[in-house]
């Protein structure tokens, strides 16, 4: 195992309680796409596409799925609050493409 692989495996274990093999299994099960938007990760750092983020419940630490950066940040901004997410959904449904309130 290279030092890069060791470091990656160590971080998965420390941060999420999973190893690299479990991450790869999740990645393959999800066919390499985000569990929410069903798109592959596109965000890059220094020209390299980053890995899908390991999404987890911040209260329990339980790993949920792999998400792209945008979806992971969105859940974070909503603090994983289902009611706030439902309100955001209602808000979007109640406004048409012209931005006029229709509800």
Where are these regions (language model features)?
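Contiguous alpha-helical segments
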Residues: 1-53, 58-62, 66-103
């Amino acid at each position: 195992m290279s030092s890069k692989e060791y470091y990656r495996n160590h971080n998965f274990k420390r941060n999420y309680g999973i190893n690299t093999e479990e991450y790869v299994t999740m990645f393959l099960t999800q066919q390499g796409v985000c569990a929410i938007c069903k798109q592959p990760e596109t965000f890059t750092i220094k020209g390299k596409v980053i890995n899908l983020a390991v999404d987890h419940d911040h209260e329990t630490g339980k790993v949920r799925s792999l998400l792209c950066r945008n979806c992971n940040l969105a859940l974070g901004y909503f603090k994983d609050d289902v009611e706030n997410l439902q309100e955001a959904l209602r808000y979007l449904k109640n406004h048409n493409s012209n931005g006029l309130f229709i509800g």
